[in-house]
Amino acid sequence: MNWIREANYKEDMEAVVEPYVAARTEAGTFERIKGQKIYYEAYIADKAKGAIVLSHGFTESVRKFTESVYYMLQAGYNVYAVDHRGHGRSYRPNDNPYVVHAEKFEDYVLDLEYFTREIVKREKKETGPLYLYGHSMGGCIGAWTIETYPDLFKKAVLTSPMLALKFPVPTPIMVAGASIIGMGKGGRRKKEPLSPVNAFTETPDFENSCDSSKCRYLYYFDKRLKDSALQTTSPSVGWGLEAVKACKRAISKEETAKIRIPVLLMQAGNDTMVDNAGQNLFASRVPGCTLAQVPGMKHELYMTDSDVLIPYWEKIFAFLG
């Protein structure tokens, strides 16, 4: 395994990782709902022993996972990743390019199942072991997916999954306030941002980011500066309401009881974005779930320095087998 270190990170990403991944990339779109194109990328390993479906987090895109895909390919996995609706190059259900809106959180789940069934399995003819890797919002989507479609994947990795949210006020108060706002203008205000946003902030702010690795944060921030498709920053009122409901559903006794596959839950010890209590409850309710905490790290565990990142990936690959 060729690990990318911090000393020459940007240079190594541009000279080694990007060309390697690009040479193995196939891009495409699909429409589960007519007129709503979902963008995806397939990355084909030189010698694959299985395949990973990658489900990214809130305001992210497939482009944020180039380094992660590089390691997955080297480990012998084909990788299939979508830009979830409202993100990246996929269909946007609202006009503000900086705001992520969701009519129904379940649409993410239905998209992911359709993508796995129709693109990964049928079109790309993946017949070997199929695994799920879901980060944050993508982890909540993943949890819902393996509850609803328990035989779709062989194993699942949920990394800092969004199973309970952190708000500056108690969740019931936030939900009540957002619901009142959302009812304005005949419900049209659900597409408006929870906090006003009309531009992408062009000044990096590593200290308040979700990352523990500065070079990785700056590398992707530079990508976002140059690509308007990567500049989503804020949730809509509707997204916030749907996310709260999705978290509650995903950790419920009724739904967690449906999970039949092994799950590895990687938990960030210093997560300021999601409430780890939701992850703890989920893990306690899923007999086949192994919870592994990475002490002191912020939300995005795949964006840590190599002294943490290498053991993180080694644990994941050992789990997948």
Regions found by a protein language model. Give the residues of each.
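Alpha/beta-hydrolase active-site loop
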Residues: 100-121
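Active-site glycine-rich loops that stabilize anionic/oxyanionic intermediates
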Residues: 49, 57-60
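Catalytic histidine-centered segment of alpha/beta-hydrolase-like enzymes
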Residues: 297-311
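An N-terminal hydrophobic leader/cap segment in hydrolases
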Residues: 1-31, 38-43
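Short alpha-helix in the alpha/beta-hydrolase fold that links the catalytic acid
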Residues: 261, 275-284
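Conserved alpha/beta-hydrolase
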Residues: 62, 69-95
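Short beta-strand/loop motif that positions the catalytic acidic residue
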Residues: 259, 265-267, 271
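Alpha/beta-hydrolase-fold enzymes
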Residues: 142-231
